Amino acid sequence: MAIVSVLIGLGFTFFSGATEAWLVDALGATGFKGELESVFGRGQIVTGVAMLVGSVAGGFIAQRTSLGVPFVLRGVILIVMFAVAFKLMHDVGFTPRKGGKLSTELRALSSATLQHGWGVPAVKWLMLEGVFVGGVGIYAFYALQPYLLELYGDPHAYQVAGLVAAIVAGAQICGGVAAPRIRSLFHRRTSALLMTGSVSVATLALIGSVNNFYAVIGLIVVWALLSSASRPIRQTYLNGLIPSRERASILSFDSMMASLGGVGVQPTLGRAADVWGYGPSYVIGAAVSALSVPFIFLSRKQNAPADTIEVVEAAVEPQVGPAGIEPATTES
């Protein structure tokens, strides 16, 4: 089971970066002039709906058959999805180049990722922010079910588990709708990220401090909504900081950084829950999340053009960032 989880995680890390890069390049090449937050927001709405349907259907199927059947169905759906993507997804705004030897390409890829990712301060600080947020977010979601059962006082109230999935899925849908509106309230994207990040930290601390089931439910709604609304804004900002030809690699590297944070953070918080309880583990998680806020501020201090301009417009008319890197380009 552990090996399967590792393989699924690796697949998601690489798949997420490539898909997002494909979307942004295609939008730039087709002359899209709208807000990129709204596009990512719509994608998140679809994800939320799918999560809601999948959670309900998965629970129903598992109850009628076995716990293994939903995993088999997930594998079948992924195979169908890959076939559909292979048939329908074509590169628009990006022309693949013929590669050389594998070792040479890997060295070039690593060098480009370091140069355009870690070598650009605004990108580097944003990636470090993800290290602290990613691990805490995953732990907070999976620990909610036993924590709420504990607060509810009935360890067999399995409907609570479904309630958690429904809350998070609903928050993804609402967050996708709210992201462009929240962004419009601020001149800079980092201002929106600082606000949502700071309030999320406070909400996590309250989730671990309030020993009332219904109050915690309300706080979970706020936390999940803020996390979901900030994601499209962060995606838009990050995409505007990196060139098209390196987009997929750097986005995958960013996803990997968040996963690496989870490797250290999740076991630590799990151990804290074993020793002190779920409530204190959420308070500790809030303290870890608070470490991400200074990195957003450091990224903000770089005054990158992507912090204020529309990313897709930047892809059409490149503007040079503080490190001499074009935020986006349709060249290959």
Q: Which residue stretches match the model-derived regions?
A:
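Helix-loop junctions on the cytosolic side of multi-pass membrane transporters
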Residues: 67, 74-101, 297-309
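A membrane-interface helix-boundary motif in multi-pass transporters
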Residues: 60-76, 154-162, 270-289
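Structural signature of the two symmetry-related core transmembrane helices
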Residues: 75, 191-205, 283-286
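Juxtamembrane intracellular "pre-TM" segments in multi-pass secondary transporters
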Residues: 90-128, 313-317
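Intrinsic disorder in cytosolic terminal tails and internal cytosolic loops
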Residues: 26-29, 104, 299-332
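Substrate-agnostic recognition of the 12-TM MFS/MFS-like secondary transporter fold
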Residues: 1-63, 74-81, 86-90, 125-146, ...
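C-terminal ends and interior cores of transmembrane alpha-helices
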Residues: 1-3, 198-211, 297
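Short amphipathic helix-loop junctions that connect adjacent transmembrane helices
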Residues: 142-159
